Amino acid sequence: KFSRNLVDKFNMKINIAYGRINYIKKFSISDSLFECKGNINLLEEYPLLFFDCSIISEDNQKLLKKFSIKIKNKAEILNLKVSGNLNILNKKINLKKININESYVASNEDLKYFKNVFENTIFDESFLKIFSLEKIKEFILEVS
């Protein structure tokens, strides 16, 4: 079961002009800070949602516990950065880069693996289903 009070704080800024949406979204879960910024041009035939996201957590155990995931390792700092784009109509993701704690940079092979896992676990239904906590948990378990 998931906690009903998953998100502690939430802030979103949206700018809409000439068919383009620019956004900045910031929220926190268990003292972990999430930030995503990007844009989408809705006038394109196949609109792409570009994103540049980060998660900064002083205690990865505390964060994962919110998703009902237990890890045996000691609590560690997590600094995750991900950028890429989503093709909402075709349910595809393209990952440009993934960095973890400045010590791991995903190779092209790793990016393909994460893309396949994302599309097969999270993006296998409608766009709105990618925000399902159960699907996020499934993705985390698959890639860890």
Where are these regions (language model features)?
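Small-residue helix/turn framework positions
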Residues: 1-143
